[in-house]
Amino acid sequence: MDSERIVFRVHNQVVSLKPEIISDQYEYKYPAITDGKKPGITLGRAPDLSTAYKSILSGMNAAKLDSDDVCSYLAAAMQLFEGVCPEDWISYGIHIATKGETITPDVLIDVTRTNVEGNWAQAGGTDMTRDPTIAEHASLVGLLLCLYRLSKIVGQNTANYKTNVADRMEQIFETAPFVKVVEHHTLMTVHKMCANWSTIPNFRFLAGTYDMFFARVEHLYSALRVGTVVTAYEDCSGLVSFTGFIKQINLSARDALLYFFHKKFEEEIKRMFEPGQETAVPHPYFIHFRALGVSGKSPYSSTAVGHHFNLIHFIGCYMGQVKSLNATVIQTCAPHEMSVLGGYLGEEFFGKGTFERRFFRDEKEMQDYADLEGARVEASLADDGTVDSDDEDFFSGETRSPEAVYSRIMMNNGRLKKSHIRRYVSVSSNHQARPNSFAEFLNKVYSESS
């Protein structure tokens, strides 16, 4: 008997079949490179740099750019940015460069060129008869890469913010060592015609390559990263938020995870810490895995580890962090339960409020204060009639342990205490809540309870 078949009856007919499902082409894919090959890209015929510069600059001024031409130019211009590799550079077993070697950004990738010629029109660019300088090339490359960062800014009411960011980036690329090559507000005008360029694989690939190079190599034109820095740890917000969290609470990753009391964390933590990834290696391909196309659906994104993401930002909200209050709640990942756990852990790592004496004239004064606080706690615990049951857990000698926190949650039947709710309401009510944000969630769920 075939162990993969099932038998059942339909209208007096016995049916035997083997259930099969479609293959999941969108399953999580880890970025580890196993074939020993550098990330690769295929582009059209390499252009003459001078011709390409004039054509692209003409397109910038006319707010009409061809993405294939831009990508071909960006790849060709990499040869202009020579730098010295500070250390031996190896990632996933691939030897990228040796310490002291002179390298350019294209050392990171394999570029395949076809015979397809670009549309190097000269309209509007013929007034420039001389060859452009390296500074002019660098300025144009920088402005083009800024289109990536601008296209990553999404959401409601971002027009003014985008305009301000674009203006500031323009100012960078008209100040030494760069030179002014376009008129003011050109970048924002061009962006409106290229608003979705962050979704173009080749453009994203080249932005990630430039960023990976200038993040490692000290260079006169390192400010080119202003437009590409968003490619670092792209689609990796789950892992990034956890890293920031453990640094803030000053615990190791192992010790921090002992506080994650929910069965939904098991699969997410297993997914996030898959062996073989170069999360702790300096300047690996891992940092830019999304841009370089070595991973499909990221296992490190906020949606991939949504319970974990929700918990960390509820703790951040309890601590009053604006970044957490503005973050978007993953609605399908138990936000109510995560807010409860976030309240207890927020109290554990942050205390009851913002105001607490932390600085002293000398060590003796600090010790005297600690002794006084200890005596006050002991006195409160000794008199059961004077301690508010809602506050009693706060005055325990073993507060900072996973066992103690778990016990408090169980004693309160998995519900928040009034002090937790007051804290949540306090930090969220004074914040201008964005749609679907943690601040909005806390306002809606807990404002009436307070």
From Swiss-Prot:
Sites of Phosphoserine modification? S389
* Superkingdom per UniProt: Viruses
Q: How is it modified after translation?
A: Phosphorylated by host.
UniProt KW keywords:
Capsid protein, Helical capsid protein, Host cytoplasm, Phosphoprotein, Ribonucleoprotein, RNA-binding, Viral nucleoprotein, Virion
Q: Which GO terms describe its molecular function?
A: RNA binding
The record's Gene3D superfamilies line, in alphabetical order, gives: Nucleoprotein, Rhabdovirus nucleocapsid protein like domain
Please provide, in alphabetical order, the Gene Ontology terms of the cellular component aspect for this entry. helical viral capsid; host cell cytoplasm; ribonucleoprotein complex; viral nucleocapsid
Identify this protein by name: Nucleoprotein
Species name: Lagos bat virus (LBV)
Query: In the UniProt record, what gene is named as encoding this protein?
Result: N
